[in-house]
Amino acid sequence: MRIVVAGIGPGSREDITPAVMQAVSESDVVVGYKYYFQFIEPYLSSKAVCVDSGMRKERERALEAFNYAMEGLNVCVISS
């Protein structure tokens, strides 16, 4: 189990680093603000669970990430 917090950059797929691409592709669960998923979609595993939410839900997303990690899953929290 692990939690990776990955910054996706200022808002373009071209700004996403190889390390973030790898973290996303290796994750069982990806948690983040729903708008950000459009930038990482090509890197998601077909088996990944995506947990998205709206603005100002940072605490809820953090709790979701910890809950999934406590189940033994690899979690990536995407941020900008």
Which residue stretches match the model-derived regions?
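Class I S-adenosyl-L-methionine
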Residues: 1-80
